[in-house]
């Protein structure tokens, strides 16, 4: 396994172009199996989660053709199975979107329980199951495989989600697309990638209204047809690079963003003392002087995203004063705190609250990523720290960040991906 080696303490300058949204891509790719025709999808981030999904579709018999670095064609017309139980499915959480897609197309599904980031224990799918059952499917889990039987027909209904689950909202939308009648999802998730999925499905012939609000209405159609779609920019990737500037200093133009999606993030960075300016579909962030303490609580969109909580916390380790970070979405999302303490951070965690007392400097150290966003937080800390930081388990990071080493190098960062046995001295020489 390779690792990242970062020689920190250098401010970041230049431009970074944001890739397509990973969270949108991993919902749209499974949706393509419902389409009777060829889907051409642009602005796909070629991160490991996406590559795994594309390989799953190939295993299932779909035609998958990579046109260029960010464009893929998917042809599911030859797909004749509703079973996805290989080990690949267990490697990523979003593989469970195949349940809704298979139910929509075949009225049945067998899908292996998913993997992915391991914070918070096993991610529950009870809201997914509740939604499928309300549509008329019989659900059970056998030997780690989710089995769904909708052979008696799926019928539209009203579904109220106990929590505004992104995963459940996606899965129910997929299953309801070709159900009989109208389905109404109340307390639906409102994240940008929910809207993007709805726009994709509508462009293929679905009838979905209200995505982006807490009530989504889906009127079932008889079939979806092929077409072209371009995925939105990645809100979380953009926020990660902005948090890196807040930590390390400098001035960076973050290109290819939707500024409205960034409001909750830019507000907190401005509160810390960063200068923020919007330029069409670009945002410039500048941090020259010291940053300041803030309080932040993660919430469902349009609140501050849980997927940016670790990265912001890393930047707050160097802010003046004592900051308070409250996690309002997931359990056990402060596992990165032990690694930041190895670098000199003063961070104390009590349940869902982290209290961060800013320090004058962080010091490079060997650390280990425990999940995708925790790994991004360690990269940010390493960029700002004095000395050398070595990050192991970088596979987590590459699940969600396309070309992260190359993008950071273009901003002036001294970061390398090296073989695990290679010394930092050799990496520096390269």
Locations of regions flagged by a protein language model:
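Short, structured segments at the rim of ligand-binding sites
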Residues: 1-430
């Amino acid at each position: 396994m390779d690792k990242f080696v970062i020689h920190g303490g250098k401010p970041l300058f230049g431009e970074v172009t944001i890739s397509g949204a990973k969270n949108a891509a991993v919902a749209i790719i499974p949706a393509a199996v419902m389409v009777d025709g060829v889907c051409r999808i642009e602005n796909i981030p070629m991160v490991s989660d996406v590559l795994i999904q594309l390989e799953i579709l190939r295993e299932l018999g779909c035609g998958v053709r990579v046109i260029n670095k960010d464009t893929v064609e998917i042809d599911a017309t030859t797909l004749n199975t509703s079973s996805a139980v290989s080990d690949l499915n267990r490697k990523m959480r979003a593989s469970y979107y195949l349940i809704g897609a298979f139910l929509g197309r075949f009225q049945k599904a067998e899908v292996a329980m998913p993997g992915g980031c391991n914070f918070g224990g096993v991610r529950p799918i009870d809201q997914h199951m509740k939604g499928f059952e309300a549509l008329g499917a019989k659900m059970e889990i056998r030997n780690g495989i989710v089995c769904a039987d909708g052979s008696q027909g799926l019928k539209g209904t009203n579904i109220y989600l106990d929590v505004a689950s992104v995963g459940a909202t996606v899965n129910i939308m997929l299953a309801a697309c070709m159900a009989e009648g109208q389905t109404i999802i109340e307390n639906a998730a409102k994240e940008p990638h929910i809207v993007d999925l709805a726009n994709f499905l509508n462009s293929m012939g679905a009838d979905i209204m209200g995505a982006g609000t807490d009530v989504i209405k889906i009127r079932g159609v008889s079939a979806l047809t092929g077409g072209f779609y371009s995925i939105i920019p990645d809100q979380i990737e953009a926020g990660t690079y902005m948090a890196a500037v807040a930590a390390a200093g400098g001035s960076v133009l973050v290109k290819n963003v939707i500024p409205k999606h960034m409001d909750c993030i830019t507000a907190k960075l401005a509160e810390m003392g960063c200068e923020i300016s919007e330029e069409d579909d670009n945002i410039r962030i500048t941090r020259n002087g010291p940053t300041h303490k803030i309080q932040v609580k993660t919430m469902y969109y349009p609140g501050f995203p849980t997927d940016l909580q670790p990265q912001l916390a890393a930047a707050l380790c160097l802010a003046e004063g004592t900051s308070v970070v409250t996690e309002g979405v997931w359990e056990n999302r402060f596992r990165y705190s032990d690694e930041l303490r190895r670098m000199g951070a003063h961070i104390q965690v009590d349940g869902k609250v982290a209290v961060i007392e800013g320090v004058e400097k962080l010091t490079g150290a060997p650390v280990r990523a425990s999940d995708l966003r925790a790994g991004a937080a360690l990269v940010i800390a390493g960029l700002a720290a004095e000395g050398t930081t070595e990050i192991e388990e970088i596979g987590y990071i590459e699940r969600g960040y396309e070309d992260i080493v190359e993008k950071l190098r273009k901003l002036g960062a001294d970061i390398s991906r090296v073989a695990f046995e290679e010394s930092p001295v050799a990496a520096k020489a390269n």
